[in-house]
Amino acid sequence: MSRHATITQSYQERASLPKTSPVASYLLRLIAAKKTNLCVSADVSTTRELLQLAEEVGDSICMLKTHADIINDFGPRTIEGLKEIAAKKHFLVFEDRKFGDIGSTVQKQFTAGPLQIVRWANIINAHIFPGPAIITALSQARPRCRQLLILAEMSSAGNLMTGSYTEQCVVEARKNPEFVMGFIAQRTLNEQPGDNFITMTPGVQIGATGDGLGQQYNTPEKVIGEAGTDIIIVGRGVYGAQDKRAKAEEYRVRAWKAYEGNWRCYCNKR
């Protein structure tokens, strides 16, 4: 079976395709301008660590993934500091909240409480185990400039997000193109001619195969070059490094080369 058209197109070309949401279009243009398809997962526990990591890796990333609920001192200083650095370094913020409850509950989790996610996260994600109404509920609660990734697959061993669940994620995404910008998945899920979903892949680390807790690692070359995904998500491989700035740049270079190899290969066949 031939590979999907989005693998043969540049990020810049995809940004202008019909039905591409404003946030997705901005992200694709940002990726092309900065030459980075790297998202760093900031799995740290204090505001100081979060903001310091954002400063150190900001020039090498297109997106920073956060877990606000593990920040012990999360508050206004966290929010304003993160927004300031994101604007200065030109990256988007993705809160990995993994919403997965009934509609009225996820609306409150998104807009209220101490985290106030709607104020600062450009992108959020959700399971669709509760049913497609979760997409409607989050969409109704958001400003126009917020977008959703559906958690369609995971990188942990033995996870149940396979087969019919993943297929249904794609079905629901196609019904909501103005809000759903893509997926968290291990491979591109673009299959139909009009699909232009952005796929982000976690579990990327150089020189490791697992962590002993179920995580299974892949390389940038495998997920971008072979699986056709768009953005790699790297956590411990960067935030656990002594020189975080240099390590982020190493991942950026390898992921970008994998993308260029894919794109140039298909451009030469046109």
Swiss-Prot record:
NCBIfam families, alphabetized: pyrF
Enzyme Commission no: 4.1.1.23
Enzyme class label: lyase
Organism, as annotated: Aureobasidium pullulans (Black yeast)
UniProt name for this protein: Orotidine 5'-phosphate decarboxylase
Pathway assignment: Pyrimidine metabolism; UMP biosynthesis via de novo pathway; UMP from orotate: step 2/2
Residues where substrate binds: 43, 65-67, 96-105, 217, 236
Keywords: Decarboxylase, Lyase, Pyrimidine biosynthesis
GO MF annotations in UniProt: orotate phosphoribosyltransferase activity; orotidine-5'-phosphate decarboxylase activity
Active site residues of this protein: K98
Domain of life: Eukaryota
InterPro entries in the record: Aldolase_TIM, OMPdecase, OMPdecase_AS, OMPdeCOase_dom, RibuloseP-bd_barrel
Biological processes per GO annotation: 'de novo' pyrimidine nucleobase biosynthetic process; 'de novo' UMP biosynthetic process
Catalytic activity from the UniProt record: orotidine 5'-phosphate + H(+) = UMP + CO2
Family: Belongs to the OMP decarboxylase family.
